[in-house]
Every structure is written in structure tokens, then in C-alpha cells.
Amino acid sequence: MAAQALALLREVARLEAPLEELRALHSVLQAVPLNELRQQAAELRLGPLFSLLNENHREKTTLCVSILERLLQAMEPVHVARNLRVDLQRGLIHPDDSVKILTLSQIGRIVENSDAVTEILNNAELLKQIVYCIGGENLSVAKAAIKSLSRISLTQAGLEALFESNLLDDLKSVMKTNDIVRYRVYELIIEISSVSPESLNYCTTSGLVTQLLRELTGEDVLVRATCIEMVTSLAYTHHGRQYLAQEGVIDQISNIIVGADSDPFSSFYLPGFVKFFGNLAVMDSPQQICERYPIFVEKVFEMIESQDPTMIGVAVDTVGILGSNVEGKQVLQKTGTRFERLLMRIGHQSKNAPVELKIRCLDAISSLLYLPPEQQTDDLLRMTESWFSSLSRDPLELFRGISSQPFPELHCAALKVFTAIANQPWAQKLMFNSPGFVEYVVDRSVEHDKASKDAKYELVKALANSKTIAEIFGNPNYLRLRTYLSEGPYYVKPVSTTAVEGAE
């Protein structure tokens, strides 16, 4: 088959209008294993295919792109970088986006290869074309360009090529295309900045990080909403958080939240700003962040009471993030009756809100109530029990009711709540004393889809592996759980059939 492909490739090179041959070659290549093509890589002459891309013939272009995609996979990245440099450069300025995407996918292979990447770094014109691809209308082209530049910047040589040459001017020039392209460049800068303190230093020296932060704290509310997402990404890294603190950015974000009450357009950016602090609290210290920025906690409580589903959703997510570790749980507990009212509100929403918000409420409840066995002190167990009882008059029945609704995602989210409390003795007693609950747990006929079966299995596993379960549930029920566990999540009980004499 490889020999047939090579023969057709030679025919394509020989003829002036080889449309039929391209169709045949395309068809043959689908059947040739890649390892066979690799053995013939030295004989693959791709020049004619690249030339055909310039003919402005739609079908030829489509066929050539597909053929080249297959043949280039058979070539080593170093070979592509050294021998097809001109073709790569032309590909990046081709009017057809599929050609650009093909070219960028090859550049993606090259930048992943430590031997080949130097060929790119030494080709200023090619780098410039990659930068200008960020400014194109096609999002896939822009994303591929950002990915390649981000990968290049992982090395010292790459950082120097991007930030200590004319490329920086090209980046700044591309940013002027429009707002969307400017945000794409910011996205690239934040990706690079997040790698290491040194990478961040290159990006701050370029002035682009400072420009982003100016927009974040500027007057345009829509720009703020976009910029806060990128700044939150930077805050996921320790060096990023340090930089934001040193530059006073965290204080500025807090001050904007303080002033949000008098801003009629605050609903555009407030969710992102509150999310920022929620992530910050979990990554650093919930207690320190909440004590230093009390407006953050205050705003979360306000948003939960809001009638705006967007605000409620963000507040619920943030409470879930904040309460995902013990320190955060204790910070919330200190707010006393306010937090009890908040729990009642979340419990109410988990029953009455639209499905998407119900799921977010259930996820937050799971996060708040979960306690790893090694952290189950008497005080913390009393706290989670008290929180659970604040959710509703009969929380166990509330979540059983939710789990019986015909939405797999909702069913799984309710099972996740049971799983979160399954290793806590007070919850095990509640489950055991709730009529029919143990039967519900071991009943395999309730779940019909894979996700639900997996979620039920996690609940059974959490119960069966608890040290207190045998004592509270009793040995017969404990053995039923162990049997379920050993049979796995997808076990189907065999149906016995009896042969009847004389039956057809």
C-alpha cells in the first residue's frame, strides 16, 4: 500500500491538474499504517502538494491538507523544521484557515521537540507569522498560535526570543487589532507568567501585565469582567499571588467590591471579583484572607440572598470552595446564625431552583459537609451535623427526593452529598434509622446510566470502608455493602432460567 501511495505522489508531481490522482492518493493513505509511511519518509516529496495549495481550488486545497496531515505525521519534527521552513511560512499566511491550522499543528509538533524547537527560534520571520496568527478571525488558528508561543516560552531561549526582540513590538501591534485580539494576547501573557517567577518577570518588564492590571481596575465594567478571569489564573500560582499582593492589586479589587453597592453595573464584574477571593482564600489561608478582606465574606452572604440566579450561583460556588478545607469551615462557623440562615437558603435552592443551580447547591453542600477521617474531631463532627440539620426540616429525605428526579446529573449530585457524610457516625445513624434507606443504597435497579452507577458505588465504598459502619448498620447490612463493593459498580444479577419439558 505504501508503494501505491508513493506512485500516486509521483503522478501528482508530474501532472498539471492531478485532481483524480489526489482523490486516489487521499483514499489510499487512509489504509496505509503510519509505521509503513515512516519507513518511506525519506522518499516522500511534499513540494508539489504544497504548491497545489496556492492554486485557489477548494477541493484540491481540502485534499492536499488532508494528505499532508497524514504524510507529515510520518516525518520527524526535526526534518519538518529544517526542510519545510519556507512551506511553513507560506502556510501561516495562506488565505484558507485549514492550511493555517495544518501548519500550526506541525509547529506544535516542532516546539514539543527539544532538537527541533531551535529551528523555530532561529527563524524570526516564522515567529512573527505565528504572532500575527493570534490576530486572525478564526479562533482555532489563534488558539493554536497561542499554544505554540506558550510552549516556546518554556525555555530561556524562547523567553528571550519573545521578549527581547522585535517580536514584542509585533505582539503589541497585533493587540491593536481589536478588543478580542487584545484579550488573546493577555491570555498568552498570563499563561507564560504562570510558569515561573522568571517568566513573570519577563512579562512584567514587557509592560503587558501592567497594562492588563490597569484595565482590570479601570472604569469599563465589561473589560473588568474579562480581565479578572485572567488575573485569577495568575493567582493560582504562588509567585503570581505574591506579585499581585506586592503591586496592591488584591487591595484594589477589594476596594472595587466595597464600592460595588453604588455602581448600577456591578453585576457585570462582581461575580468574577468574588470568585477571585474565593480561590485566593483556599490557595492561601481562608482565615487570613477573610480577616483582611471582610467585604469578601459580607458580599458572599449578600449574594446568596439575591434574587439573581447568576449572583446566587457564584456565591454558592464560593461558599463551597471556602468550606472545602477545615480552616475555611471554621471561618464560616464563626459567622454564627448568619451562616445557619445561609445554609437554609442553600437547602431551599437545592430543592426549588432551576436544575443547573440545584446541582451547584448540592456540590457546595458536599464540599461543606465532607470531613476526612483524620480530621473528625468531636467538635468538627458536631459542627457538620448541625450544618446538615440547618439545610432543611428533614435533609435526608430532601436529598433522597432530589435523587429520585429524572435527571442523571441531579441524581449524581444528591448521591455525592450522601457520600460526603457517609464516613461520619452521626450521618450513619441517620441513614440507618431512615426507613428504607439501607435498601435504597444497595438497590442496583435505581441507577441506569454509567455516571449514576459510579456515584452509587462511591457511596457504598465510603460506607463500607468506614470503621464505625459495622457497629451502626449491623453485621448483615455491613456484609451487603461489602458484597456490593466486591461485585463492582456495573454488576448485573444473572437471571436464572428453567427449562420446561416440551417447550419449543
Swiss-Prot record:
<dbReference type="InterPro" id="IPR011989">
    <property type="entry name" value="ARM-like"/>
</dbReference>
<comment type="subunit">
    <text>Interacts with PSMC1, PSMC2, PSMD1 and PSMD6. Part of transient complex containing PSMD5, PSMC2, PSMC1 and PSMD2 formed during the assembly of the 26S proteasome.</text>
</comment>
<dbReference type="GO" id="GO:0000502">
    <property type="term" value="C:proteasome complex"/>
</dbReference>
<dbReference type="InterPro" id="IPR019538">
    <property type="entry name" value="PSMD5"/>
</dbReference>
<keyword id="KW-0143">Chaperone</keyword>
<dbReference type="Pfam" id="PF10508">
    <property type="entry name" value="Proteasom_PSMB"/>
</dbReference>
<comment type="function">
    <text>Acts as a chaperone during the assembly of the 26S proteasome, specifically of the base subcomplex of the PA700/19S regulatory complex (RC). In the initial step of the base subcomplex assembly is part of an intermediate PSMD5:PSMC2:PSMC1:PSMD2 module which probably assembles with a PSMD10:PSMC4:PSMC5:PAAF1 module followed by dissociation of PSMD5.</text>
</comment>
<keyword id="KW-0007">Acetylation</keyword>
<comment type="similarity">
    <text>Belongs to the proteasome subunit S5B/HSM3 family.</text>
</comment>
<dbReference type="GO" id="GO:0005829">
    <property type="term" value="C:cytosol"/>
</dbReference>
<dbReference type="InterPro" id="IPR016024">
    <property type="entry name" value="ARM-type_fold"/>
</dbReference>
<feature type="modified residue" description="N-acetylalanine">
    <location>
        <position position="2"/>
    </location>
</feature>
<protein>
    <recommendedName>
        <fullName>26S proteasome non-ATPase regulatory subunit 5</fullName>
    </recommendedName>
</protein>
<dbReference type="GO" id="GO:0070682">
    <property type="term" value="P:proteasome regulatory particle assembly"/>
</dbReference>
<dbReference type="GO" id="GO:0022624">
    <property type="term" value="C:proteasome accessory complex"/>
</dbReference>
